[in-house]
From Swiss-Prot:
Coiled coil: none
Protein name per Swiss-Prot or TrEMBL: PHD finger protein 23
Residues recorded with modification N-acetylmethionine: 1
Organism field: Homo sapiens
Major localisation: nucleus
PANTHER family: HISTONE-LYSINE N-METHYLTRANSFERASE SET-26-RELATED, PHD FINGER PROTEIN 23
Disease tied to this entry: A chromosomal aberration involving PHF23 is found in a patient with acute myeloid leukemia (AML). Translocation t(11;17)(p15;p13) with NUP98.
């Protein structure tokens, strides 16, 4: 190996002349050729006007002496045949790519002409030419591998304008405005919700509210979720499934709606006057019940409580109240907590109450002077004792705990 490197080849100049003559000659030729090549490329790309020396450039390369050096030492611009081959391949590739672009242009399905002309501006045309030239440089020495910037790939990559069809909006983009409308319609009332194509439970009217049994907040929420699952989707584009943040917002809105409903039930049912009912036969033993009716005059309290007690049999199975041994555990509904039925004019507030056997009014055990451990079978409120003296006869002598 070392001997082969030490032996001078017959084609090499003498070792004394090599360091003196070769480096300046090599540097001069490289700079000239590179400058000419750059001017040719710039002229071809249209940046500078074409010079008359272009035709003489291949001949100038032939004046340089041929050197039979190894491929590692030789540059791309050393010999005249390589220069000529380079120029010819440039010209051929440019012409063929132009021809291909001209053929593929009218046949390929593209967008309307206005968008196509906008996409193919003069700047983009010159950019395409430069990219083709770069690709031809890469393909000179090695095998022709389709590079990402090859003319064929350029013709294919110039097709995406044809695929610029209007894409429909995603479901996430469309989900927010209909949901906002749905919330607004829910807040406006049953009429607006029905107009939007949503099945909705109507709000309780003053007469309705007395008859229907009270439902706990947790059960209301479950019912609302079930109804929301059974609702028809609103007309229009499909909605995306609500995200976690949306469900939290909806729960907050549901709580606000329930508070509004409580206000309407408590405030809206009060001014309804109801005639007093005729005296009834004594009832079965009264049980402690946490529920009542909205505040009104004494007669409306009595009638509302009787209706509530009639409908209360169905609601008691749902766990409206629980009596465990002698200790009374009270679970309140959402709108019965603030109801005022006792003559102390204080709300229910979760305290144990007893029902009058005649008028059905609910009275606090503490106001009736009754202990939790000694609840009587028949109880008559103070008003029934004053208005109906037969109450004493029906129930026997008054209980010691009664006022």
């Amino acid at each position: 190996m070392l001997e082969a490197m030490a032996e001078p080849s017959p084609e090499d100049p003498p070792p004394t002349l090599k360091p003196e003559t070769q480096p300046p000659e090599k540097r001069r030729r490289t700079i000239e050729d590179f400058n000419k090549f750059c001017s040719f490329v710039l002229a071809y790309a249209g940046y500078i006007p074409p010079s008359k020396e272009e035709s003489d450039w291949p001949a100038s390369g032939s004046s340089s002496p041929l050197r039979g050096e190894s491929a590692a030492d030789s540059d791309g611009w050393d010999s005249a045949p390589s220069d000529l081959r380079t120029i010819q391949t440039f010209v051929k590739k440019a012409k063929s790519s132009k021809r291909r672009a001209a053929q593929a242009g009218p046949t390929q399905p593209g967008p309307p002409r206005s968008t196509f002309s906008r996409l193919q501006a003069p700047d983009s045309a010159t950019l395409l030419e430069k990219m083709k030239l770069k690709d031809s440089l890469f393909d000179l020495d090695g095998p022709k591998v389709a590079s990402p910037l090859s003319p064929t790939s350029l013709t294919h990559t110039s097709r995406p304008p044809a695929a610029l069809t209007p894409v429909p909006l995603s479901q996430g983009d469309l989900s927010h405005p209909p949901r906002k409308k749905d919330r607004k319609n829910r807040k406006l009332g049953p009429g607006a919700g029905a107009g939007f194509g949503v099945l909705r439970r109507p709000r309780p009217t003053p007469g309705d509210g007395e008859k229907r049994s009270r439902i706990k907040k947790s059960k209301k929420r479950k019912l609302k979720k079930a109804e929301r699952g059974d609702r028809l989707p609103p007309p229009g584009p499909p909605q995306a499934p609500p995200s976690d943040t949306d469900s939290e917002e909806e729960e907050e809105e549901e709580e606000e709606e329930e508070e509004e409903e409580m206000a309407t039930v408590v405030g809206g049912e009060a001014p309804v006057p109801v005639l007093p009912t005729p005296p009834e036969a004594p009832r079965p033993p009264a049980t402690v019940h946490p529920e009542g009716v909205p505040p009104a005059d004494s007669e409306s309290k009595e009638v509302g409580s009787t209706e509530t007690s009639q409908d209360g049999d169905a609601s008691s199975s749902e766990g409206e109240m629980r009596v465990m041994d002698e200790d009374i555990m009270v679970e309140s509904g959402d709108d019965s907590w603030d109801l005022i039925t006792c003559y102390c004019r204080k709300p229910f507030a979760g305290r144990p109450m007893i029902e009058c056997s005649l008028c059905g009014t609910w009275i606090h055990l503490s106001c009736a002077k009754i202990k939790k451990t000694n609840v009587p079978d028949f109880f008559y409120c103070q008003k029934c004792k004053e208005l109906r003296p037969e109450a004493r006869r029906l129930g026997g002598p008054p209980k010691s705990g009664e006022p």
